[in-house]
Amino acid sequence: MLKLEQVKKQYKNFTLDCSLEVRPGCITGLIGQNGAGKSTTFKAALGLIHTDGGTIEMLGKPERELKESDRQQLGVVLSDAGFSEYLQVKDVIAVMKSMYPNFEKDCFISRCEQFQIPLDKKIKEFSTGMKAKLKVLLALSHDAKFLIMDVK
């Protein structure tokens, strides 16, 4: 599912040098102090930042060769990313339907009800916990084959 070999990223006061493998069916957690490189590792794996060396494979392909259809198989939660907080969940549903052919609208709405996430309230009015729940529900809403979750 995910393989990083000697992935390097150099910042002014930090150097990431990471190798790891996540096999199908496995749950793997990265645990470390603030600034240890957990978020950097996730962003590198997703191709969101340029790395300074090493190789990254996801879903059996080099990360750079992933197509849109491959990326639609990923469910991603990043602590510093999400939808505009001026949107309502019902607006997010429309976006998800247009981006993910496998988006399961009815299941998503049912889960929102189960976890008390209102569809007609702006995200900026949500508590921190409600925002976190929404991100996870969105990551699970389109039958993703691989989940990457970077939460605080």
Stretches with model-predicted labels:
Residues 54-65, 69-70:
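Conserved ABC transporter NBD signature motif
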Residues 46:
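Helix-to-loop junction immediately C-terminal to a conserved catalytic motif
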Residues 29, 72-79:
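ABC nucleotide-binding domain signature
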Residues 1-19, 24-26, 67:
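A short, flexible loop at the N-terminus of ABC-type nucleotide-binding domains that lies
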Residues 31-33:
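The feature captures the beta-strand-to-loop junction immediately N-terminal to the Walker
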Residues 78-135:
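ABC-family P-loop ATPase nucleotide-binding domains
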Residues 147-151:
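Catalytic Walker B motif of ABC-type/P-loop ATPase nucleotide-binding domains
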